[in-house]
Amino acid sequence: MRILTICGIGDIHWVMLKMESFIEKECKGVIPEITVWNFDGRPRADGFVSRIPFVKFAGYDNEPMGRQQKRLFHEMYMEGFKDVVSGFKGYDYFICVNGSLRIGHSMETIMRQYSTNWNYKINTEDCISPYSEPYIIFYFSNHGMFTDWVAKMPPEKIRSFMQQIKGYKLILTGSSWDSPFNQELEDNGVINLCGKTSLTELFGLIKGASAFVGWCGGNTIVSQHLNTPTLMLWSNYFSHRAFQTNWVDPDRLGKVYIPMDVETANNDSLMKNLGVLLGK
């Protein structure tokens, strides 16, 4: 069984919430091969898929999008017209639930014939933090759609917030393409690890962190799944507010995961919600 997914870690995580039930009903007990469509030229999901025990990573499909492929991608990624397509690009299935989540559908109603496992297994036993003292990790970027986030919460506002946090090491994380922006956030001993960690090292940092604060990305999406307190910052770039919570285990809402809008966030509200997650 060959399954194609899109390329982001968060995108794949949302599919995996349904995958065990999908395998049981459609794959007849055979472990499916997951190929990641690397249409944006930023391969970053192999280390994630390889950690999921009920699937096998089969590599990347590096073919760019053609016109007809873009049309279907838009329907699945943006509009939620489809979640599962058979035979696309020669694969048994192409699965993408982003569009349905984006327009406000709940995970329980997406691919409703398959149950949701909010606690599916990600193998992270070898992911160990190098820090013994308390620390908080952060994810900020000005890449792609995140220019909208930065317009509402620019570097000086981020630095002002981080300066309010006492008693924790502050660690910036992200990919190599996030590094130039995060250099603007280095202040008062802040540690910048953007582009300097493998996925194994990042997962170790996430597991050992007192909290993770930052934009809505694959890293913060997986953070709450690993039960690290996660303060996720959203923008009205996404019109449906349900998208902030419709993919999260209801038992984690308000306890492990709190969403906020960058448009209205200030130091007081950020510190209040961070305090809730830290148990203060």
PLM feature segments, named:
Residues 1-280:
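Catalytic machinery of carbohydrate-active enzymes
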